[in-house]
Amino acid sequence: MADVKPYQIFPTVIYEFNYTPVDKIMMTSYIDQLKINTPQTPDDLHELSYFAELRDKVKEISKQYLDDLQYEYDKIEITGMWANKLNAGDSHAPHTHSNNFLSGVYYLHTNENSSPIQFFDPRVQAHVLRPRNTPNLLNASMMQYNAIEGRGYIFPSWLSHWVPTTEDKRISVSWNIIVRGEYVEPNTLQNAYI
């Protein structure tokens, strides 16, 4: 057998975390009592006291994400945090989170009938030809993660994702993060301070 060494290049990293905030009941009650006509709340939850502990945990894990991937930055800023309240029969169309670096979701209320989050492979060219296969991490065009109460995910904001039609109530909290600091090397005619 030949001496073959496979390389995996251009990875897309998603962090999973499990966490139960002290104010979980208050957070859920606050979202439930809001009288809104859309599935999303206003995006200022990170400024409310009920959500302060979750906000701080999100920043802590985002810092770990950036440090593990060896990014240089001055600070992490949450640009928005909102709740998504889906009822049976609702879905969330495919989307990305423009003008941000990291995004995330935390499941506040779910059960076994709550739809997962599904992420799409951003390399559209990789799926022009699709021989039959046994789906796995190396050949998938979509990956899904179950919506488990008390679990969260942090991912690159450019990564397209959606929520298929859910069979039961599902409350999640989502957020966006901008990374403040120098972007690109100096004198490249593309560098900026954001």
What are these regions (language model features)?
Residues 1-74, 91, 190-194:
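Non-heme Fe(II)/2-oxoglutarate
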Residues 9, 73-75, 96-100, 167-169:
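A generic structural micro-feature
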Residues 76-84:
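A short glycine-rich, His/Asp/Glu-containing loop-to-beta-strand
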Residues 79, 100-102, 113, 169, ...:
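Residues that flank catalytic or metal-binding motifs in active/ligand-binding sites
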Residues 84-154, 164, 179-191:
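Catalytic core of non-heme Fe(II) oxygenases with the double-stranded beta-helix
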Residues 159-172:
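Ligand-binding loop in jelly-roll beta-barrel domains
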Residues 176:
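An acidic/histidine-cluster motif and surrounding catalytic segment
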